Amino acid sequence: MFTMKKSLLLLFFLGTISLSLCEEERGADEEEGDGEKLTKRALSILRGLEKLAKMGIALTNCKATKKC
């Protein structure tokens, strides 16, 4: 029982250290990639607006020609 507690404590300790290292790396990556994320988000918004505009034009054309 005592050895099991020691091994569980060791696993918990190592997991905590590894988690904190991952969080530090992620934080550094996020700082570098903020501009890149913003660009990707802007492009995805523009693509969505483009699709919306195409649908609007198609619907307007359909209503105008009465071929719906």
Swiss-Prot record:
Q: State the Pfam families in the record.
A: Antimicrobial_2, FSAP_sig_propep
The UniProt entry lists the main location of this chain as secreted
Q: Which residues form the propeptide?
A: 23-39
Q: Where in the cell is it found?
A: Secreted
Task: Tell me the keywords, alphabetical order.
Answer: Amphibian defense peptide, Antibiotic, Antimicrobial, Cleavage on pair of basic residues, Disulfide bond, Secreted, Signal
User: Could you give one GO CC term from the UniProt record?
Assistant: extracellular region
Q: Disulfide connectivity?
A: 62-68
> What is the annotated tissue distribution of the protein whose record heads this document?
Expressed by the skin glands.
Domain of life per record = Eukaryota
Q: Where is the signal peptide?
A: 1-22
Chain's role: Antimicrobial peptide.
Q: Which family does it belong to?
A: Belongs to the frog skin active peptide (FSAP) family. Brevinin subfamily.
UniProt protein name: Palustrin-1c
The organism named in the record is Odorrana versabilis (Chinese bamboo leaf odorous frog)
Its lineage reads: Eukaryota, Metazoa, Chordata, Craniata, Vertebrata
